Swiss-Prot record:
Protein name per the record: Protein OPG170
Glycosylation sites: N70
Inducers of expression: Expressed in the early phase of the viral replicative cycle.
Known role: May interact with several cellular chemokines to interfere with chemokine-glycosaminoglycan (GAG) interactions at the cell surface to alter chemotaxis of nearby responsive cells.
Keyword Iron in annotation: no
């Protein structure tokens, strides 16, 4: 009995110390810890295909494929990495969310120097690329044997915000994208770094609400 109590008492301060050490990463004087969240909602010109969801996370970017659409996000001059990719589909729309995790829960940590942070605020570009996974040229044949070309690949200029650059393939009717870059230690430090936000939408020039449903990892 006494041995059990002794073991419990020994474990309690150790547990507290572990949590403190984890979040003490935010006390660094020469590093900042920034997080990123990218949300993409793409509506296609036809119902989604039944495909296997696939995702990939690489340095400074990630991608996800589902429903016949590949959504790729590259972070240029942002010094940030994604840790999770989630996706949700509904009839003719693909919803995707790319996020990072807190520095005390996941490696590699999104740490940067003050100079990197300044460059991020001035030069960070979130390059979003929507690519159709079906070659529509195979589906349209003129009676004289000449193939009909699909609509020209359309490049959407980054004239709405200062962070997002978006390229959308021919099968996408509408697209909405959000970007949030925030101080991961903002709730711990006395003075947090202001959050950077940007959005792009092709629907009436107004941002849609972010889908609240649960995103599945794939």
């Amino acid at each position: 009995m006494y041995s059990l109590v002794f073991v419990i008492l020994m474990c309690i301060p150790f547990s507290f110390q572990t949590v403190y050490d984890d979040k003490s990463v935010c006390d660094s004087d020469n590093k900042e810890y920034m997080g990123i969240e990218v949300y993409v909602e793409a509506t296609l010109d036809e119902p989604l295909r039944q495909t296997t969801c696939e995702s990939e996370i690489h340095k400074y970017g990630a991608s996800v494929s589902n429903g016949g659409l590949n959504i790729s996000v590259d972070l240029l001059n942002c010094f940030l990495n994604f840790h999770t990719v989630g996706v949700y589909t509904n009839r003719d729309t693909v919803y995707a969310k790319f996020t990072s995790l807190d520095p005390w829960t996941m490696e590699p940590i999104n740490s940067m120097t003050y100079d990197d942070l300044v460059k991020l605020t001035e030069e960070c570009i979130v390059d979003i690329y929507l690519k159709c996974e079906v070659d529509k040229t195979k589906d349209f044949i003129k009676t004289n044997g000449n193939r009909l070309k699909p609509r020209d690949f359309k490049t959407v200029p980054p004239n709405v915000g200062s962070i997002i650059e978006l390229q959308s393939d021919y099968c996408v009717n509408d697209v909405t994208a959000y970007v949030k870059i925030y101080d991961e230690c903002g709730n711990i430090k006395q003075h947090s770094i202001p959050t950077l936000r940007d959005y792009f939408t092709t629907t009436n020039g107004q941002p849609r609400k972010i889908l609240k449903k649960k995103f599945d990892n794939c």
